[in-house]
Amino acid sequence: MSKSFQQSSLGRDSQGHGRDLSAAGIGLLAAATQSLSMPASLGRMNQGTARLASLMNLGMSSSLNQQGAHSALSSASTSSHNLQSIFNIGSRGPLPLSSQHRGDTDQASNILASFGLSARDLDELSRYPEDKITPENLPQILLQLKRRRTEEGPTLSYGRDGRSATREPPYRVPRDDWEEKRHFRRDSFDDRGPSLNPVLDYDHGSRSQESGYYDRMDYEDDRLRDGERCRDDSFFGETSHNYHKFDSEYERMGRGPGPLQERSLFEKKRGAPPSSNIEDFHGLLPKGYPHLCSICDLPVHSNKEWSQHINGASHSRRCQLLLEIYPEWNPDNDTGHTMGDPFMLQQSTNPAPGILGPPPPSFHLGGPAVGPRGNLGAGNGNLQGPRHMQKGRVETSRVVHIMDFQRGKNLRYQLLQLVEPFGVISNHLILNKINEAFIEMATTEDAQAAVDYYTTTPALVFGKPVRVHLSQKYKRIKKPEGKPDEKFDQKQELGRVIHLSNLPHSGYSDSAVLKLAEPYGKIKNYILMRMKSQAFIEMETREDAMAMVDHCLKKALWFQGRCVKVDLSEKYKKLVLRIPNRGIDLLKKDKSRKRSYSPDGKESPSDKKSKTDGAQKTENPAEGKEQEEKSGEDGEKDTKDDQTEQEPSMLLESEDELLVDEEEAAALIESGSSVGDETDLANLGDVSSDGKKEPSDKAVKKDASATSKKKLKKVDKIEELDQENEAALENGIKNEENTEPGAESAENADDPNKDASDNSDGQNDENKEDYTIPDEYRIGPYQPNVPGGIDYVIPKTGFYCKLCSLFYTNEEVAKNTHCSSLPHYQKLKKFLNKLAEERRQKKES
């Protein structure tokens, strides 16, 4: 294009005030160049900058005219005379009268804000040397300036839905000016190109516009890294409020590039942040979703997303930045902000103010507040606050506050292990619904030592970092009211019970299991649950239990071809019997019973049998019968004594077993059984001396008198509590195998011959005198490969054995493997005998 055409174009544009920017095709760069001419006319730029603006106006005008566009640019010397006409460019009508009467400064500010520029952008541009600014590189410079501003860190005073009434409003320009801005934008930029970023309303009523803005932002790698700029005019303070002032609404856009640049954008402020910042700092659940984190300016849409956000490194970094902006604010008690506001007390991070001690008195009254800076980082070492500010408040509390841990097995042990090396633990409290724990040390120095250590060393629970700091809200933890004088037993609370799992179902004795733990210390008590393949062994001290656990962690424990899992029991700290101080005695009695089942003892049933046979062969069989009755009464008394001693322990063990696998046992208990309540109790029982009770029960059954029958019923009721592990002792199992098959073979001899000469079993004596068991209730001797009682295995969710209260998913396993097991056979025999007894009683009545 010729120079004359350019000059004539400029003349027409300066005289004609009705040119339309959209019709002329002016983009963002042309609009930005217009804004550069305004400060030149208003005297905000020096003389060199004015000449520079004139140069840029000429260059941009020439380039736009070459594309066929009609520019509305003017030189710096004539911009002051043509300001009103330039302001009207692109308008579809004259501006409101109130806007025309305003000063040039207000009009220029409106134009700059509408184009996405500010006076600070002009100041930045004025620092460039004149020889480096040319019409060719001016668009790139302007884009870099605008991108650099949008990349600055977000403000910390964003509002959010539902909570705007409790926070300080951000600074806004007067209402009439704001309406004029909106009117100007609405009239002037309806037909802008799609490449120009839209003007956004940051009222946070809707996140759709802002999210769309972030989607359309064009990030490039060639960002300006000239250094950090001062924000002297970014904030201003008033007497009672802390309002955030922005040069334009566009400075609230964008996300921070890094912590160094973030910290340079904010100045230290007095008092406390808005309530929305405090709530997000403590990670309180939002009232509704979607929710905008007022600290990070990040929208979240669910509880899971909110939990991940507050536990992330980005949120922790912004929280640390918030602490640096408000150095006087103490996040633990928030007294600098709420001054005892009851709402903040209810919304505190600890939902149990009645269990913990009273909060300490406020330290913010009467002077500037100096509060501790807890550890906020995920690694507990990267985001420490100024610990020296806490020295004046250390003596007020000895409670260590642990947050953001993940729950798992042995959680209490993991938490107490964090602070145990620093001193004696007086008390502790682990919250159920919130992942927070409070541990009270014996002295303040111990608590402070633990907190100081974890400011430099990461505190790990289950391999994941947690936050550890000294609680200033609670000085100590109250003890339960019912036990004011009871001392806290650290070893007792931590537990000394070893849990063995993945044990074989059968084929071993109690002593074989106890030998696994004997090398590590003295055994105080134990519970063996063969049907559940687990055992609980209580050691005399916790050190002995820990020694076994630590050793088995390093070297796997193998028992009868199975790798046994060994860990410290989380549910049971010790095995307590209902009768106090009987645990050791019962254990000794169990050991004595083991010794009683020696090879000599095994001969006693056979001797008794031979004596009975000899007495029956004599001419006076009544004498042998009297001897049998006496021996039966003696055995009954011994059995009754043993049962009265062991009944409390068995009941307790059944409760323990029910609590071991609550989820597993719930399905078994809630699903009804036709056998009755006694069979359910039988599944919950656990016994370690069943081998002796079986021969004694046989001796009881030899008594045919009515009194012995009543006593037999009592013994049977107690005995049914012990049916889960019939083979509790190896020797007992051998005795059962030696005596019961003999007795059952005698029954088989009775069936075809109807001969009463062979009465080795006391039950046959009873049947001979009073009643003979019908064939439908008879059961032959136990044979491992012959299943019995298959009718009691019924299909439900799987295949449920009503006798044993067990579920199986495989029918073959249920009806072949399970029904061929010894415990199932013994329960089937008991049940059939019970039915036969009930039928006999009905006939007698």
From Swiss-Prot:
Modified residues (N-acetylserine): S2
UniProt main location, coarse: nucleus
Position of the Glycyl lysine isopeptide (Lys-Gly) (interchain with G-Cter in SUMO2) cross-link: 3, 132, 146, 245, 269, 478, 487, 491, 515, 522, 554-555, 617, 630, 717, 734, 768, 834
Residues with the Phosphotyrosine modification: Y158, Y202, Y219
Phosphothreonine carried by residues: T150, T679, T739
A single MF term (Gene Ontology): miRNA binding
Phosphoserine modification, residue list: 4, 9, 14, 22, 41, 118, 126, 157, 164, 188, 195, 206, 208, 211, 234, 264, 275, 509, 511, 533, 596, 598, 604, 606, 654, 671, 673-674, 689, 745, 757, 760
Residues spanned by motif Nuclear localization signal: 708-716
Keywords assigned by UniProt, alphabetized: Acetylation, Immunity, Innate immunity, Isopeptide bond, Metal-binding, Nucleus, Phosphoprotein, Repeat, RNA-binding, Ubl conjugation, Zinc, Zinc-finger
Superkingdom to which the source organism belongs: Eukaryota
SUPFAM superfamilies: RNA-binding domain, RBD
Residue ranges with Basic and acidic residues bias: 160-174, 201-213, 600-643, 689-704, 765-778
First and last residues of each zinc finger (Matrin-type): 799-830
Residues annotated with N6-acetyllysine modification: K3, K522, K571, K834
Biased composition (Acidic residues): 653-665
Positions of region (Disordered): 147-174, 187-213, 342-394, 588-785
Compartments, record wording: Nucleus matrix
Example of a GO cellular component annotation carried by this entry: nuclear matrix
Domain RRM: residue ranges: 398-473, 496-571
Swiss-Prot/TrEMBL GO biological process terms: activation of innate immune response; blastocyst formation; heart valve development; innate immune response; post-transcriptional regulation of gene expression; ventricular septum development
Alphabetized CDD domains for the sequence: RRM1_MATR3 (cd12714), RRM2_MATR3 (cd12715)
Protein role: May play a role in transcription or may interact with other nuclear matrix proteins to form the internal fibrogranular network. In association with the SFPQ-NONO heteromer may play a role in nuclear retention of defective RNAs. Plays a role in the regulation of DNA virus-mediated innate immune response by assembling into the HDP-RNP complex, a complex that serves as a platform for IRF3 phosphorylation and subsequent innate immune response activation through the cGAS-STING pathway.
PANTHER family tied to this protein: MATRIN 3/NUCLEAR PROTEIN 220-RELATED (PTHR15592)
Subunit (UniProt): Part of a complex consisting of SFPQ, NONO and MATR3. Interacts with AGO1 and AGO2. Part of a complex composed at least of ASH2L, EMSY, HCFC1, HSPA8, CCAR2, MATR3, MKI67, RBBP5, TUBB2A, WDR5 and ZNF335; this complex may have a histone H3-specific methyltransferase activity. Interacts with TARDBP. Part of the HDP-RNP complex composed of at least HEXIM1, PRKDC, XRCC5, XRCC6, paraspeckle proteins (SFPQ, NONO, PSPC1, RBM14, and MATR3) and NEAT1 RNA. Interacts with FUS. Interacts with IGF2BP1. Interacts with IGF2BP2 and IGF2BP3. Interacts with RBPMS.
Protein name per Swiss-Prot or TrEMBL: Matrin-3
